[in-house]
Amino acid sequence: MGSRELSLRERQVLGIIIQSYVVTAAPVGSRYIARNYSLGLSDATIRNVMADLEDEGYIHQPHTSAGRIPTDLGYRYYVDLIMKVQRIDEDEKRRMETDYGQIAMEHPGTSRDVLLSAAKVLGCISRQLSVVLSPTLSDAVFERLDMVLLSSTRMMVILSIHSLFVKTIVMELPLEVSRKMIEEVSNVINERLAGLTLSEIRRSIAHRLAGSHGDGALKDLIVRSAGSLFDESPIFERLYISGTEYIVDQPEFKQPERVRELITMIEDKFSVARLVEKSGHMSEALRPSDMDVTISIGSENSTREAEDLTIVSTPYYAGNMVGRLGILGPKRMDYEHAVRVLNYMADSLTATLTDAN
């Protein structure tokens, strides 16, 4: 099925079916195409073309209608070989800059504000579920560590990393410490570890702190805790989601059971994060030519819960770290628009986090 190259006529009809279905959410018939598009083809000819497309698995007929709707294969052919992504238009660009650019100019204290803002703007503009996955931190460059004493046996450790990223951990202490002790140890850590990546610190912290000033017991505790202090945050803690109200308003989710299934999936932040993360490692076949964008459609997704969804994702950068932006929505998605706004937001987010260095 779908093994040969489609003719120009077949490509035109398939493109019209998908574009019309995206707008109307209604199956598309040959008469509709003949009346609304100047292809120079009769209703009968269009019907024959649609029959060929159906035989090859690009479209199919829902049991309740005489019209046709795209299959996963049809959408795949469309995004790979028919879709033309234009540059973002000026009105939309201004709207995104108004909503997001204000925060970028204010240079907020941490990455959390930036990433959450990006998710909200992307969800609002795309009218889909938007997902921002913060970068993995193995290659993140350590700037400084601050320790805040909460009680004599409890303290908060704050790791500051390049590009506004901050990691916070509360530690229970098996020994009593004073503010002077944590100040001395913090100074030693910052002097000896600043500028290293977190993975370098995990491998060499004991050697690098050997023979340094400061309370030995507290330094030993930091060394023993390096695996958690200087390690990745759990993937679900790296996830920022927005736009649930837009995706549940789509016709595909009118039935209460479908809405419940969707909300259950969204609330499982680990699963959503894994979906977006995996989309970045999928086959080159899922990337339209000349695009740094992955589009995973329906059955191409890694879980049953996402079989009726499309995931469009692209990387963004913060120094030498890589995060991922994604749009999740029904397969009946305006793919050109999704790719356009996703690329623009990725560029904006990269610029903001790069300027923060």
From Swiss-Prot:
One example GO MF annotation: DNA binding
Family: Belongs to the HrcA family.
Protein name: Heat-inducible transcription repressor HrcA
Functional note: Negative regulator of class I heat shock genes (grpE-dnaK-dnaJ and groELS operons). Prevents heat-shock induction of these operons.
One Pfam family of this chain: HrcA
Keyword Lyase: no
Organism this protein belongs to: Chlorobium phaeovibrioides (strain DSM 265 / 1930)
Domain of life: Bacteria
